[in-house]
Amino acid sequence: MSQYEKLLRAILSGTQDKNILFSDLQLVLDRLGFDCRIKGDHFIYTKDGTEEIINVQPIGNKAKPYQVKQVRNIILRYQLGG
């Protein structure tokens, strides 16, 4: 199982939202085909075919748990990563 698959599984499980590294969340979004633009400490991800814009910011080296949940909901809603 690749690192990406492990990260995707961790995000989809919903049990490790507090322990997801920001760089790992970025890796998953990049692999899912999201485009990123940066404005200050805000990383704004968009993808053709999705209505939502994902706006994430790091807290230290971790991703904010509520933002991991938002990413999970978008992955599930659009059936990405499978």
Protein language model annotation of sequence segments:
Residues 2-39, 48-82:
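Basic nucleic-acid-binding interfaces
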Residues 42-44:
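Major-groove recognition helix of helix-turn-helix-like DNA-binding domains
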